[in-house]
Amino acid sequence: MTILHIDASINGENSASRALTKSIVDQISKAQWGEAVIHRDLAATPLPHLTLDQFADTSALDEFLAADTVVIGAPMYNFTVPTQLKAWIDRIVIAGTTFSYGANGPEGLVKGKRVLIAITRGNFYGEDSPSAGFEFAYRYLKAVFNFIGVEPEFVFADGLGISPEQREKALESALVEVELLAA
């Protein structure tokens, strides 16, 4: 069993999404008796934006397909995912490999893979929030993974930019959710 651990935050040790993905990976590894972990830090070693020349490099796709579980840290920057994460997604959403077009429309080809995504946001963007219309990270990630045949699981830490107290409260709550997800 292999875990692919994806981090996209540029905030290093101060990153809430990195703290959450580390906790998820640690708990899954412990529960599964030390699964192999492949860590791809998209902020430290970003993939170039997709070009025709870059399309031939299938290393990100190969890692994704080989993993049994994928854990993704997705901080929300300017209402969506970081460009580093988008560049990675561009390499795993491949016609004929992770999805196909058929008579009934697109069909996801990725089966039996668990994807856990930790989304961190500076404000509150839930459905009941006045800012809900500005949230494009969760909706994008859910749509992309559904498109390729995966039902992703999410944990959220919201309101991180409001105050230090709110940040601490949100992270504590998210870590409780992580324990439930990783079980």
Task: Report each predicted region and the residues it spans.
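N-terminal beta1-alpha1-beta2 submodule of the flavodoxin-like/Rossmannoid cofactor-binding fold
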Residues: 1-97, 176-183
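Structural beta-sheet core signal
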Residues: 5, 72, 115-119, 154
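A short, flexible beta-alpha/helix-coil linker loop
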Residues: 9-11, 122-125, 159-163
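Active-site donor-binding loop signature of nucleotide-sugar glycosyltransferases
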Residues: 42, 120, 157-159
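Functional cleft and adjacent loop/helix regions within the main domain
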Residues: 55-66, 107, 133, 143, ...
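Short, structured loop/turn "capping" segments at alpha-beta junctions
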Residues: 95-99, 150-152
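Short, glycine-/small-residue-rich phosphate/pyrophosphate-handling segment
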Residues: 101-147
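Glycine-rich phosphate/pyrophosphate-binding loop and the adjoining helix
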Residues: 128-183
